[in-house]
């Protein structure tokens, strides 16, 4: 007769059942949307047809934003290439009236993310925003969301989860934005790893002879 040792069974169940509770980081990526403006998400990335109004320029990009709800930080990374104009600003807008479409005001740092490469047609950017600092926000966004950075963070992250926030890259050719991508949550790898470990434990000890 085979049995799973009680202590190991408890550990395995804990790993499977509580994995999501340990996830304090959420990774969002930019996704392209349909050019018709109906709000249909497409592949990861940023482009001109995703803009509102749309454009036919061939520039592309891809960005990620890693949110930590304990540290209250947003780690940003983006790469872009093939722009028609040179970059003039970049930031995240929120919240659009509906998911994956329409426009909204700037929520993050204005006039542009600190350190974002300006005057170029291709490049990369990486920086981490401290969401507890007023300098990470557009002052108008903070004022419209309770007057505190905490209120701004709560509503901004809700917009990210709701697909109502988009990363925009503005250029000399298209002042309103040459390429953009809506923020979309990616699967949680940390939770998946813990669940996998838990299931592996069950498999190993259920096959192990006494």
Each PLM stretch: what is its role?
Residues 1-9, 189-190:
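Bacterial N-terminal signal peptides that target proteins for export
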Residues 9-17:
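Bacterial N-terminal signal peptides
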Residues 10, 115, 206-207:
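Generic detector of N-terminal low-structure segments
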Residues 19, 88, 190:
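Residue-level signal for beta-strand positions within conserved beta-sheet cores that form or flank
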Residues 19-23, 207:
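Bacterial Sec-dependent signal peptides at the C-terminal "C-region" and cleavage site
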Residues 22-90, 94-185:
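Metal-centered catalytic cores of metalloenzymes
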Residues 188-206:
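A short, hydrophobic C-terminal helix/tail in secreted or cell-surface proteins
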């Amino acid at each position: 007769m085979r049995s799973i040792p009680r202590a190991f069974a408890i550990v395995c169940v804990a790993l499977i059942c509580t994995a999501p509770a340990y996830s304090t980081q959420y990774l969002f990526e930019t996704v392209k949307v349909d050019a018709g403006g109906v709000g249909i998400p497409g592949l990861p990335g940023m482009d001109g047809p995703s803009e509102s109004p749309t454009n036919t320029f061939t520039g592309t990009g891809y960005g990620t934003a890693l949110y930590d709800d304990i540290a209250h930080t947003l780690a940003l990374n983006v790469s872009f290439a093939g722009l028609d104009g040179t970059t003039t600003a970049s930031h995240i807008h929120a919240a659009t009236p509906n998911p994956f479409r329409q426009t909204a005001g700037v929520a993050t740092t204005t006039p542009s993310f600190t350190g974002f490469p300006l005057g170029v047609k291709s490049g990369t950017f990486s920086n981490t925003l401290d969401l507890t600092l007023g300098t990470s926000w557009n002052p108008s966004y903070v004022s419209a969301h309770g007057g505190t950075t905490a209120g701004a963070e709560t509503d901004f992250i809700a917009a990210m989860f709701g697909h109502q926030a988009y990363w925009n890259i503005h250029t000399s050719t298209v002042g309103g934005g040459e390429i953009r991508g809506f923020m979309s949550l990616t699967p949680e790898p940390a939770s998946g790893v813990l669940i996998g470990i838990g299931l592996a434990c069950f498999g190993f000890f259920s096959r192990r002879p006494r």
